[in-house]
Amino acid sequence: GMPVIEAFGAEHLRSGLPICYTSVDSVFQIAAHEEHFGLQNLYDLCQDMAGILHKMKVGRVIARPFVGSLETGFQRTLNRRDFAMDPPSATLCEWVMQAGRPVHAIGKIGDIFSMRGITRCRKGSDAQLMEHLADEMRQAPDGSLTFANFVEFDTLFGHRRDAEGYARALEWFDAQIGPILAQSRPDDLVIFTADHGNDPTWRGTDHTREQVPVLVHGQNLAQNQVFDRMIPFQDVAATVAAHLGVVAQGQGRSFL
């Protein structure tokens, strides 16, 4: 993404035309300068394009705003927005909401699920998202779902193949998540996983290693348990549903 902005940023400022590009996954991205093109104009354009591209089964249209100049360099801002296709059927978020429980999204979760089944969404940098996560876990009512996505591992370090930066980010995450887990309540269930890998030491700039870890924390769980099978996303959803006592509407089965 950044090489595209660096290559066409000056032409974008001169012509006023947006920068459009695609990725190997099912996304169409539009980059534009927040000040010269206008942030709302970019959002409106992406919304219009989503109406066309979703019919072609393109999963997401992503607004990629940036600032800066050719002389000072261009930088992306935190105002990214994803315009995703509606999920084809009800998801875990909707199961929980249908049961009368709140669903609190952190990061790009609201965009990923087109705000379906989301009570509220809080955004920001990963550092801000960690603060939001700690705050949401402190005040989460019984039976609620808090769903967080930390995207900078992918955008800042994975795609850019910055192994040292990735390592520092993991160390930061480890240091931050410990106190958050320590404040969890006896009946809380915390699951760490990802939707794909992105090895910063591998060639190219695309996602890698689709088999990602599933780590589970809970004060009432058996310690050091190792699952003896692959765990698909649908089983993660079924597990959370079973823990919360809501009806699972998918094909998954709980692994706990």
Q: Which residues does each PLM region occupy?
A:
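Feature captures the catalytic ectodomains and active-site-proximal regions of enzymes
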Residues: 1-256
